[in-house]
Amino acid sequence: MDDIVNSVPSWMFTAIIAVCILFIIGIIFARLYRRASAEQAFVRTGLGGQKVVMSGGAIVMPIFHEIIPINMNTLKLEVSRSTIDSLITKDRMRVDVVVAFFVRVKPSVEGIATAAQTLGQRTLSPEDLRMLVEDKFVDALRATAAQMTMHELQDTRENFVQGVQNTVAEDLSKNGLELESVSLTNFNQTSKEHFNPNNAFDAEGLTKLTQETERRRRERNEVEQDVEVAVREKNRDALSRKLEIEQQEAFMTLEQEQQVKTRTAEQNARIAAFEAERRREAEQTRILAERQIQETEIDREQAVRSRKVEAEREVRIKEIEQQQVTEIANQTKSIAIAAKSEQQSQAEARANLALAEAVSAQQNVETTRQTAEADRAKQVALIAAAQDAETKAVELTVRAKAEKEAAEMQAAAIVELAEATRKKGLAEAEAQRALNDAINVLSDEQTSLKFKLALLQALPAVIEKSVEPMKSIDGIKIIQVDGLNRGGAAGDANTGNVGGGNLAEQALSAALSYRTQAPLIDSLLNEIGVSGGSLAALTSPLTSTTPVEEKAE
């Protein structure tokens, strides 16, 4: 070992010792050197005096030095005053507040030194720092609140905050602190139960609070009532508007339905009128065709009957003439001139009787023809009357429907229906009345025609009944005495005068004078232009070319 030490050069040994000493010194320096940071500074006291270190560092030797760390961060110190500790405002009201103070140590040698001297290590504990400076904050809050009313505090919070900040800033600077900002985080009126009525301030504030709350309650009640009234009025207006809209919708629906019904009724009326016109034309065509057929058939039958009657009459006349010639020849041969004259008179009587029978047959034919013509005229009149009445009824119905539709469109919805029903009934009644009037207008002529046709049809029976007394005559003797005013006196046929005419006519006229109920029968015959007093009067319509005048009604 000694050899090794002796073998090392002295300079090297010296160097090693120096390095060791430097290493030891570095370790000691590292252990004694304290650095400051941006968040924390410190104040060193002791050997060498007070030194504030904000950046960099310093040697702190135990026993010789002591350091006080200072927190350079911004600290939030929250102060709450409520219930019985609440603030009293200028108007003697109590308010609960929560105020946050944001403070920090002044970033200066003086500020840090002052903070270290007055606060020490409390800057590292916000709660300890708050407890230390809280009274300053409370004093500033009370002083500022006493200068403002509760409403001013609420309405101008920035003024309150600024007042607190100005009041407390100077006190904080004495501790090396600076106030960054003040925030009023909570503000509310203190409850009434925390007011002490035995305290003058609280009593005054309680009185004002009671007055204010009651006034506000009344105002709130008035507002609530006004709001309720306004809401009800709004609901009423809304309901009224809703009902009005529903009514308008209902009216529009009814109007639309009415228009649809009106259009439908108009279309149905046009269709009905068109169909009625078609039916009328078809019926008129059919009636015309049937009438032409009936007229043709009647004309044909009348022509056949006329030819037949004419032929029979000619044959009968020839037979009568032949018989007369034969009888005259036989009388000339068998009896004298006087007897021949008597037989001739008898032959003339029989000829006249045969002629009367022929005339009666002709009258029957004429009666049949007139009856057919009357029936045809009746049918034509009835068809024309029916057509006219139907046309008038259709026109009245269509016009009534049009008037009803126009009235329905102009009247109210419910009134329209009732009014339409009433007008429809009136229109139908008017149409029926018009039809009845038309029928009544034609009824007299039709009745008269039917009456005359009935008389014509019953004429044979009337004549038969009128000569009923002739059945009691057993026989008729004709005694002709010339020169006794034969045919000289023209008596009235209705009185039964037998004067004038041949023997047959005189005999028949005399027989007719024995008719029963002659006035009544003559009156009935006069209705159709026939006189029943004599054979000539009965056959005058057949032999006369003068038309029978219509009897004035």
Curated annotation (Swiss-Prot):
CC annotations in GO: cytosol; membrane raft; plasma membrane
Pfam family, one: Flot
Keywords (A to Z) from UniProt: Cell inner membrane, Cell membrane, Membrane, Transmembrane, Transmembrane helix
Subcellular location as annotated: Cell inner membrane; Membrane raft
Main location: membrane
Mutant lacking the gene: phenotype: No visible effect on resistance to oxidizing agents, proton motive force-damaging agents, membrane or cell wall stress. Improved resistance to ampicillin, enhanced swimming ability.
Transmembrane parts of this sequence: 10-30
Gene3D superfamilies given in the database record: Band 7 domain
SMART domains, sorted: PHB
Designated name of the protein: Flotillin family inner membrane protein YqiK
